């Protein structure tokens, strides 16, 4: 599966949107990938995550556990783990930091794939990787369905992406005039407190 195949899954679900969006990172962009519209379809999710699992295996060999950041990473993390034949757990924000909760644990010496939905700056992924390491985990790869940074994001581990895009994203005080003229939509989840 290549980048165009991934984008076709998003288009088919009505999930490739144009306008003026505030991303989870706080950056503004003319393009938003509404992954929840894709993940509501098991067949689309299966195709994407099966392909991501194959890329992970090709890059690092077998893994013992997938760990994902809540909320957005839970579905792709679980489905990717299913194709990798390993368990899936997730970290949640508590006091502003990602932590393992709900009796989840990381087995000593486990080879871990941190699986995310979409990476823009890599901040959520990096925070997830740090939480895994703090819990004693060995993160061998960070993986995502879409890297919209064009390869510039730093998730704190080698990044494997099913699709890599170079989508513009701007700080609020550096918007191009044509983007500033469009009303803002804020579909992100990062500002949810938990």
Swiss-Prot record:
Keywords: Glycosyltransferase, Magnesium, Pyrimidine biosynthesis, Transferase
Residue numbers binding orotate: 120, 148
Cofactor: Mg(2+)
Binding residues for 5-phospho-alpha-D-ribose 1-diphosphate: 116-124
UniProt-listed Enzyme Commission number(s): 2.4.2.10
A GO molecular-function annotation: orotate phosphoribosyltransferase activity
Catalytic activity reported: orotidine 5'-phosphate + diphosphate = orotate + 5-phospho-alpha-D-ribose 1-diphosphate
UniProt pathway annotation: Pyrimidine metabolism; UMP biosynthesis via de novo pathway; UMP from orotate: step 1/2
SUPFAM superfamilies: PRTase-like (SSF53271)
GO biological process: 'de novo' UMP biosynthetic process; pyrimidine nucleobase biosynthetic process
InterPro entries to which the protein is assigned, alphabetical: OPRT (IPR023031), Orotate_PRibTrfase_bac (IPR006273), PRibTrfase_dom (IPR000836), PRTase-like (IPR029057)
Domain of life according to the entry: Bacteria
Entry-linked NCBIfam families: pyrE_Therm
Self-association and partners: Homodimer.
Similarity section: Belongs to the purine/pyrimidine phosphoribosyltransferase family. PyrE subfamily.
Protein's job: Catalyzes the transfer of a ribosyl phosphate group from 5-phosphoribose 1-diphosphate to orotate, leading to the formation of orotidine monophosphate (OMP).
The protein's name: Orotate phosphoribosyltransferase
Species assigned in the record: Phenylobacterium zucineum (strain HLK1)
Gene expressing this chain: pyrE
